[in-house]
């Protein structure tokens, strides 16, 4: 007998059988952005910079002096359970999608770029366009991926481009990621 599908997940009919969450972490609404997590951290915070990043050791000016994990020290390239925000916040069985998971989604689903215009809450005479992706699986079921943009100084154009994290460390052809690289995300350009 097949296991029941958790209420907050959806089976898109992917070849791997992987279930996807119906919403981003930090919200139960599929159209909301949810919370922002630094890669390898399991809680949100008010200040996202080198000196507050748990995987960096910095000097007093915030200059990175050492990468504490996922570096040439340990050669780990995929988030471990204790560093996975989905596992820490949603429980056993949940995890941040890998590059392979995202590729399966890109290869096997129909992607539709949709823009919805909504009134601004404080001034209903003004409107804001909100972009999102409707991702329909082989079985006809779908998930919604809001256009998230990036975070602060890295990239922040949530009206168009979308960046979702992967559990994989970005690898350069000659080794592990550069300590200044923020390429741990799937970039979805508007429209695909």
Where are these regions (language model features)?
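C-terminal, surface-exposed recognition/capping segments
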Residues: 3-52, 57-74, 78-192
């Amino acid at each position: 007998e097949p296991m029941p599908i958790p209420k907050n997940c959806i089976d898109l009919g992917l070849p791997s059988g992987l279930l996807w969450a119906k919403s981003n972490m930090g919200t139960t609404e599929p159209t909301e952005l949810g919370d922002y997590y630094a890669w390898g951290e399991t809680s949100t915070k008010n200040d996202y910079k080198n000196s507050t990043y748990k995987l960096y050791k910095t000097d007093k000016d915030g200059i990175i002096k050492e990468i504490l994990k996922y570096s040439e020290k340990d050669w780990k390239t995929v988030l471990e359970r204790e560093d996975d925000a989905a596992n820490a916040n949603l429980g056993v069985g949940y995890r941040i999608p890998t590059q392979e998971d995202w590729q399966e989604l890109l290869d096997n689903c129909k992607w539709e770029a949709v823009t919805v215009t909504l009134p601004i809450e404080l001034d209903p005479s003004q409107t804001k366009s909100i972009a999102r992706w409707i991702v329909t699986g082989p079985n006809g079921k779908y998930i919604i991926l809001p256009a998230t943009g990036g975070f602060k100084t890295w990239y922040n154009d949530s009206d168009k481009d979308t960046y979702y994290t992967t559990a994989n460390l970005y690898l350069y052809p000659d080794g592990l990621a550069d300590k200044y690289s923020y390429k741990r995300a799937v970039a979805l350009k508007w429209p695909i």
